[in-house]
Amino acid sequence: MSITVPTSRAVKGKPYRATLALLLAGLAVASVAASVADAAEPFTAEAMWKLKRLADPAISPDGRMAVVAVTTYDMDQNKGDADLWLVPTKSGKPRQLTSAVSGDSSPAWSPDGELIAFISKRNDDKEPQLYVIAVDGGEARRVTNVPTGVAAPKWFPDSRRLAFITQVWPELKTWPEMAARLRERADSKMTARVWDKAPFSYWDRFLDDRKTHVYSVGIEGGEPKAITLEAGHPLDAAEPDASSYDISPDGTEIAFVSDTDTTGTDPNFDVFVMPVDGGAARNLTADNPANDFAPLYSPDGRLLAFRKQVIKGFYADRARLMIYERRSQATRNLTEDWDRSADGLVWSPDSHSLFGAIDDAGTRRVYRFDVGGGTPRAITGDHSFGSLAAAGSGPVIIGLRQSFSEPPTLVSIIARTGAATKLSDFNDAALANLTQGKVESVTYKGANGEDVQMWVVYPPNFTPDRKWPLHLLLHGGPHNGMTDGYQWRWNAQVFANWGYVTAWHNFHGSSGFGQAWADSITKEWAELPYQDTIKAAEWFTAQPWIDANRMSAGGGSYGGYLATLLLGRPHPFKTLVAHAGVYDLYSQVATDDGATKGRYGEYWQDFERINRNSPHMNAANFNTPTLIIHGQLDMRVPVNNSLELFNTLQNRGVPSRLVYFPDENHWVLKPQNSVFWYQTNRQWLQQYVKPGPGEAAAAPAPAVSTQQ
């Protein structure tokens, strides 16, 4: 007989099975555990917001210390405050370095190990500015006073200068001129915005006519000097960050990413290099019509790594790890035959290899890539890792580890074995008093008879001798595969604590399962994920501990689209939740990225394909009670989608509720709004799918083991 029992961390195996004998024995154990469980608190949305959130860490040049921004949220104030903490990578207690009310972010360690640069908005700052602070403490000192604000600081090797990015008007030559234009636009009673070229928006904001460029400044302050401005190749206007540029180890050259498209409808990001002191910029990737991005110099300065896609206009195309040899100007592809996407890359201090945080079959694993070639090698197994940094001998690798049961936690990782040692305990005390359900990874047969991986989170008091309701969560993207990681917006532990078996399935199109899997839905958005969702429900129905009459489903973004799609097709769910979901694919394509060239042609060239994939075409079949949620500031999936869906359901007499947030975007990010979001979900689900254990489950037949 083969019995697999979920543990508090992710495991892979067969679904929860138990014989009658095991159940009887478990009752005795359960009575002992009950007293412990009674002392614990449920994992609620309010409890989740009490947890501290860690951002990307930076590591000291000798590898002995890490610095990380830690955000603590105040529910009454409805906001968070981020402070910098110093954490030893071997032994010792963390030490708080900053304590500003406004919040500090983006720490960067100086090459000499003496200073930490960071971004903050303090005192009379109108925009975020660059600050430095000594590692041994003291007062932080402002370095810039740029009216357009700064982001993504990086050090020059002499530890006397810093680079940063900001968005400027190239035709204005001085900072006072830029400050004057900002004031003029802010004070103007005329509020019209005008565009002659796409794109005009990004996620939750309108884009203006400024351009993103790299500047440098001395640590003592003074006038920042433009680096990329005169070359005429701006960085990404929509989402520039630290991966947009890098500085060579000798400080003489900069590598950066710029969109070479001049139409606004056919983006092509390329990697450029140019002298820091000025001169022409050279395009290293002009021969590739798809995107190249994330340049990263090796510590010895010989090599430049970057990532390359080959399918134009497909953001989920796997990124190849490319190595450019600066002396010979030759480029090599390290991962052409590897069916995963290179991501989250950092160099080993010896320049012989890189480490990456790779989306891999439902988990983010750390992989090692040898510069000499060979198959990339996974060095971690369970849990998900990201935000890597490396330094010192060994090397010392730090990063954030997380799972469905562990919020991002600072750890050190042994490169040879992948063993991780926890360095921070910011959330240990809070988590010790919270009940979290067991987590399991299962595989079932989905569309086309192909295996689909699925994460299942059980209620903390789950026993397989009773029938339980299901809440199936539908992830977004659609290519953002669900990994074993902590979710702040759709936290499965919160749903499980309400009394629902909660699951995420990595349907066709999900990242981390190979290029063919990701690309299988790019022309037809609907069919395969729909089939995978129905097959997931059928898999659960076959389990003796699931009540087939108490099943629900819901998701956001593409997950909201999939929920809306289910409305018009046969499905077994008693209620659905659609957050920021696409309802009318015509208006969605036209408003979101309609100006961008379509990979499979434009919507006016193939109405039948759009009709097959648009939920609104099946409105005559809508009968399922539905909770609809949307934020006014959402420009990724504009709010009209949810307004149209709600009105359609109301017209048809289908029980429905519209929850509208005037101050939220594609996500619900403010603490009080988030708690209300969870409360509303809970109330709605309880109305149609009663939580908690129900009638006794039929005893399962003994399972015949097929394990070796």
Per-range role (PLM):
Residues 463-468, 473-513:
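Short substrate-entry loop that stabilizes the transition state in hydrolases
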Residues 70-83, 98-104, 117-131, 139, ...:
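A flexible loop/linker signature enriched in serine peptidases of the S9 family
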Residues 61-62, 111-112, 157-158, 249-250, ...:
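Residue-level detector of Asp-centered blade-edge/turn motifs that repeat once per structural unit
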Residues 88-92, 134-138, 218-222, 275-279, ...:
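Short loop/turn segments that connect beta-strands within beta-propeller blades
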